[in-house]
Amino acid sequence: MYKRQFQNSEEKPLVYGDVEIHNIPRRRLRGEEEKEGIIAESVFVGFCGTDYTLMNMGREGNLKQKFPEGCNRLINGHEGVVWVPDENRFAIVLIRGGNSYDPTRYTEEETYFEYGCDQADGLFSDKNYYNPDMLLKIPDGYVKDGKIPLSICKKLVFSDPYACMIFQRERMEDIGEAQNFRVKMAQYKCSEAEAREIARKETFDRVCIFGLGTTGMFIGDLIHQRYPDAKIVFVARSEESSPKVSFALKQAGASYVRSAFDTNEELA
C-alpha cells in the first residue's frame, strides 16, 4: 500500500512508501458503538495547517501520542473525497480519533486532544479503512455517469474544516449566552429567554479573528452570515493587497490589520 506518513524523525518527518493499513474499530460519536471500517480508495485529499503542525511535531520527536494503536506512524491528510467500491459511490470522509471536550459540554470520562485526527490515519494512501457512518453522502447532482468533477472535489475537501467552524461558532454562542444573560436581564429588564437571545447576539458585536487561513476565513464568513451587523477584524501576516485578504474582507464585510513582525518586541 503506497502512502505518505508522518513519523518521529528530525531528518525525515514526512516519508513516502509502502505501509500496512489496519482496520481499527472506531465510533462516530461518543456513546455509539465502535464499528469496523470498510475499504475506500482516496480520490482527492487536503493538506492543511494541522498536517504542517503534525509534521513539525514529528521533526521534534513529539508525535507518539498521535499514532494509531500499534503503529509508529500517522498517515496524514485528514479531509477529502474517496471512492467506496462496496457501495459504488463517492463519499466525503470525516476522521474522528477519540473524544474531545469544550469547556461548556465535556463530561468526566472525556479526554482533551488538540487535533481530531489523534490516533486516526488520514487519506494519503491508496486506500484505507473508514467507519461506514463517517463516509458522508455527496448531494445529488454532483456525480454524473459515475464520475465526479475535479472542481467539485476541490470544494468538497473543505467540508470538514467548514463543519469545524460551524461547531466553533455554536460554542461561542453557547458561552456568550451563558456568561452574560443575567447581566442582560438586569440591563434590559427582560425575561431570561429574551436576555439569553440578546446575550448570544451581542457576543458577536465586535469580533477579532487572528489568522487568515482556511478556518479563519470560514469562521468570519459564518459569523457574518448569522450576524450581518457584527464588526469583524482579521489580524494576519498577508499583504493588504493580496487576493486572499480582499476576498475575506468582501465575504465577511470585515476590516483588516496586518501583523507581520518577527518578534514579540516588534509587535508590541
Where are these regions (language model features)?
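Glycine-rich Rossmann-fold phosphate-binding loop(s) that bind the pyrophosphate
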Residues: 161, 211-214
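Conserved small/polar residues in nucleotide/adenosyl-binding loops
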Residues: 1-5
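Adenosine-nucleotide cofactor-binding segment
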Residues: 183-212, 224-268
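NAD(P)H dinucleotide-binding glycine-rich loop of Rossmann-like/cofactor-binding domains
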Residues: 78, 93-206
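Cytochrome P450 core scaffold surrounding the K-helix E-X-X-R motif
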Residues: 50-56
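Residues forming the Rossmann-fold NAD(P)(H) cofactor-binding site
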Residues: 217
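Glycine-rich beta-strand-centered segment in the early N-terminal region that forms part
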Residues: 27-46, 59-105, 122, 141-142
